[in-house]
Design a protein with these regions (language model features):
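Primarily the internal scaffold of c-type cytochrome electron-transfer domains
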Residues: 36-84, 100-133, 149-464, 471-480, ...
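Helix-start (N-cap) detector for alpha-helical repeat units in TPR-like alpha-solenoids
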Residues: 540, 574-575, 608-609, 642-643, ...
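Structural marker of alpha-solenoid helical repeat scaffolds
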Residues: 569, 603, 637-638, 670-671, ...
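TPR/TPR-like (Sel1-like) alpha-helical repeat modules
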Residues: 666, 670, 676, 680-711
């Protein structure tokens, strides 16, 4: 295949092809007519048992011999340990899969267990609680160490396979998995070929054998579920179990759940927008790309990318992976967000009962400003390109925020929010997509000590397909002439500076990526409509996103008004009326909601989204039969809608149809094993149906997984001491910049206040 790093050319390819033909031909001549598969399998099983028993003799079975891998959910095919030498190295796979190997080497998977910041964080856990607790992390960061029994007292701290992290033979040896996450996979002994009977061959296999039986190689290393999001959920979903924190179960990462409920999955009727086709994790993170070197896994000269492009900009910098760095930045900038500086609210807000004068949508209406004016900019940020939340996962150490700046005509900054301050720290009052994890002492877990979590004091993110409204109040200084520019930018860097400096053992500067940005110029004096830019949404969608953002900010009256503007512009758009009804339903105006749902159904009689919300209204009105009929229709159209199954199960329960209710909640658990409502209701249903053992099991799971009602006291005390975060934790707040202290408005708009 040529010297390492060499690009394939026709002459070299011919030499390679001839050499391979010779190798394969010689192997065929030397190969025995039959293989003693049974004896090989017996020998392999005996060797594995011997290794497992030897390992078990010195292993810390903290959670009992029946749960050797806790606090990870990982397990092996027969419960025995697997010799780490059974795992083929990535270099071995690279013989034939050069390009996949080269891409993998630069990926987060490859470096999952060797980057300094991860090792420092795990060492905190090892010192504080013991190495056996680190199985919780290593089940996904270093699976070979977990299933080989290496994470116990007295075992070597440095292992050769650590440098490969999640290597080829890890993912391609997983036999099955489920959506509990935290390493919820079943690992088998790696094999790169199966025999004539389809049984794995665990002995070393030559390249020639593989090339002679590519079909048997494929059967050994590929499974259909590797192409599903459920496969990824084994690690890209996680919880903090009692076995780790000595407290109770807490959700940590819910990427799979977020995807499954989004429009990208097309498994739920509830998203605000509809995608044309299904996108899985692999669709975005393993896009097919043109082959550059050589790889026998390529099809039609294209290869499923093994870079797993995401958001880690630090690994490429640490190891000098320039191509990966450029590709990650490109990925982060690829139409993930739409930023819309949607409105300007004129006047101060000292009188909270006063409806403000609002110019919206900016660029399409005329308005006036003057030097000395106090303005509040309404910035709408739409998550249109991510199939999960931004920022995803635990969020405590990741850092993404909104930078907002007002400049005069000469480019001088008049006021701003979200600047990087001395030492690399972010402005503490910036609007950030992050959270705050609080421990039992009411203190911040600022080094990702998730094993000490008790409560999340603050949690801000934008889910897939949703929008968020960020408001900034500022004053145009007296004497300003010409114009001012207003710029809003979503920025991203991998970690906050405090965690990164800890992780690297020194101050370490990280790349900062501008994911999306918009600038609007406001004239001092008259402002007239302008031609929309190429990246701007259509007017109806701008109003729609504004309405979604207001809805999530619990500003129901304003949200209804925004959605009504959509209905005026698109009278044939059924979801406009459904959206009005959703806001009215949350506002507890059930009669009004019902009327708008009927308008929507007149336009789209089979809309599962509208039928779902009509069912909720009907049930609230006491019409259970009608509600059940609508929900049954929804479930037929969306059999994996967790919301529909949950509500249908409760409706059956209200009618004492316990068997039907049980079926719905069991179906719900097949989609989400940790659904809290399913645990609670099944604990009641099983008891009423005489299944007392199952009832007790579900009751115990509910008790473990429900939030601790007293934990909020830690959060309240922390917020009391951190006023900058207390303000951020209020869903409807204003970032007050260069203006005197003001009282926030009761609402942003009124029917008569908009231009």
């Amino acid at each position: 295949m040529g010297p390492a790093g060499a690009k394939t050319n026709p002459a070299w390819a011919g030499i390679v092809a001839g050499s391979l033909l010779l190798v394969v031909s010689c192997w065929f001549a030397a190969a025995p007519k039959s293989v003693k598969a049974s004896s090989e399998a017996d020998e392999a099983a005996a060797a594995r048992l011997a290794y497992s028993e030897k390992t078990a003799a010195k292993y810390n079975f903290r959670y009992g011999k029946e749960f050797p891998f806790l606090p990870s959910n990982a397990t092996t095919d027969n419960g025995q340990f697997i010799n780490p030498k059974s795992f083929y190295t990535a270099d071995y796979c690279g013989h034939c899969h050069k390009e996949s190997h080269d891409q993998w080497r630069q990926s987060a998977h490859s470096n999952s267990n060797r980057v300094p910041y991860y090792l420092k964080n795990v060492e905190l856990l090892n010192v504080e609680k013991g190495i056996e607790f680190s199985r919780h992390c290593e089940g996904c960061h270093d699976p070979i160490a977990v299933v080989s029994g290496a994470l116990t007292q007295g075992a070597p701290k440095k292992r050769p396979y650590d440098q490969d992290g999640v290597t080829c033979s890890v993912c391609h040896s997983i036999q099955q998995g489920d959506t509990r996450g935290t390493g919820s996979y079943v690992m088998g002994v790696p094999a790169v070929m199966v025999d004539e009977e389809g049984k794995p061959i665990s002995r070393p296999v030559s390249d020639g054998e593989i090339l002679a039986h590519l079909d048997r190689h494929s059967k050994a290393v590929m499974r259909d579920f590797y192409r599903t999001s459920e496969f990824c959920s084994s690690c890209h979903k996680a919880a903090l179990p009692k076995a780790l924190n000595d407290f109770k179960w807490q959700r940590a990462i819910s990427l799979y759940d977020e995807w499954q409920a989004s429009s990208f999955a097309k498994q739920s009727p509830l998203p605000f927008y509809v995608k044309d086709s299904v996108s899985t994790c692999q669709t975005c993170h393993m896009q097919r790309e043109a082959l550059k070197t050589s790889d026998y896994g390529a099809k039609k000269n294209q290869l499923a990318s093994h870079r797993w492009l995401g958001a880690n900009t630090v690994i490429p910098k640490i190891y000098g992976f320039d191509e990966q760095a450029a590709r990650v930045v490109e990925f982060l900038k690829n139409s993930v967000f739409n930023i819309d500086i949607f409105a300007l609210e004129h006047g101060d807000t000292e009188d909270s009962a006063k409806w403000q004068d609002v110019a919206a949508p900016l660029g399409l209406v005329s308005f006036k400003t003057a030097a000395g004016d106090v303005l509040t900019a309404d910035v709408v940020i739409q998550n249109k390109g991510i199939a999960h939340s931004h920022v995803p996962e635990q969020r405590d150490m990741y850092e993404s925020w909104v930078e907002f700046a007002v400049k005069d005509a000469n480019g001088r900054v008049l006021t701003q929010s979200g600047a990087i301050e001395g030492g690399g720290e972010l402005d503490a009052r910036a609007h950030s997509f992050t959270n705050r994890l609080i421990n039992v002492k009411g203190e911040l877990n600022n080094l990702h000590q998730v094993w000490n979590n008790r409560v999340v004091a603050y949690n801000n993110t934008i889910q897939a397909g949703r929008s968020q409204l960020v408001r900034y109040a500022f004053q145009i200084p007296a004497g300003t002439t010409g114009s001012v520019s207003i710029t809003a930018t979503v920025k991203y860097r991998r970690f906050n500076q405090h965690f990164m400096d800890f992780g690297m053992g020194k101050h370490y500067e990280m790349p900062i990526v501008d994911m999306a940005s918009q600038t609007r110029v406001v004239n001092i004096g008259e402002n007239k409509p302008v031609t929309p830019g190429p990246l701007e949404n259509k007017e109806w969608m701008r109003w729609n996103n504004y309405g979604i953002a207001l809805l999530d900010a619990q500003q129901y009256a304003a949200s209804v008004h925004a959605f009504e503007r959509v209905a005026q512009m698109r009278s044939d758009y059924a979801d406009a009326f459904t959206n009005i009804a959703i806001a009215q339903f949350q506002w507890e105006k059930y009669g009004d909601a019902h009327g708008n749902l009927e308008k929507a159904l007149a336009l789209a009689p089979t809309s599962a989204r509208t039928l779902y919300y009509r069912a909720l209204v009907e049930r609230n009105e006491g019409h259970l039969d009608l509600a059940i009929g609508d929900l049954e229709t929804v479930v037929k159209s969306f059999p994996r809608s967790r919301d529909a199954h949950r509500e249908l199960g409760f409706s059956y329960y209200q009618q004492h149809k316990y068997e039907l209710a049980r079926t719905e909640y069991e179906t719900l658990q097949s989609i989400d094993p940790d659904d809290l409502a399913a645990h609670y209701n099944l604990s009641i249903l099983y008891r009423r149906l005489g299944a007392k053992d199952k009832a007790a099991q579900q009751a115990a799971m509910f008790a473990d997984q429900k939030d601790d009602p007293m934990a909020s006291t830690y959060a309240l005390e922390y917020l009391r001491q951190h006023t900058e975060l207390a303000n951020e934790s209020v869903v409807w707040h204003v970032h007050e910049l260069n203006v005197p202290a003001i009282t926030q408005a009761a609402a942003p708009v009124s029917a008569g206040g908009l231009h």
